[in-house]
Amino acid sequence: MLFRSDAKVAFAPVIAKVTLVRRFDSLQRLMDAQDFALGLGTQPMEALVELDSRIAANRRDFAARFDRARLLMAHQKWTEAMDELLEILMRDKAWSDDLARKAYIAVLDIIEPPKPKVADGQIPPDDPLVASYRRRLSSAILS
């Protein structure tokens, strides 16, 4: 969350184009997650404990799962956030107008390292973590 305010300032001139470029949308979703985390007003661990208890009481509390994923995203706990979003996708693919899927894709966009330059006709290597979570998303969506 250290770069949040700098990112907002840098992002302001292109905010109108957010829906046109997926990478911008992904950055906006990250900043929204950071705003959510800041707005909780409690310590992150306290908020996680509260969300965990809500989820334990109702495994289908997708709002709590999504809030937990946003909190994890804000603290750059990418794999934990994607695992939580996958839990939503496996139970209800279209929950809240595909919000979990969109957030999941945003995390993939954010954590994917830049592709190295390769010779013409060659395919750049995939990041193993990103490739693994893309497969998991495909499995959840297509099942």
Feature names for model-found ranges:
Residues K8-A12, L51-D52, E84-L85:
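Inward-facing hydrophobic residues that define packing positions of alpha-helical scaffold repeats
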Residues M1-L2:
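Short, small-residue-biased leader/transition segments that mark boundaries at the very start
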Residues Q28, R68, A103-Y104, L137:
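Structural register within alpha-helical repeat arrays
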Residues K17-N58, D127:
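Alpha-helical adaptor scaffolds
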Residues L51, R65, R101-Y104, Y133:
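TPR repeat positional signature
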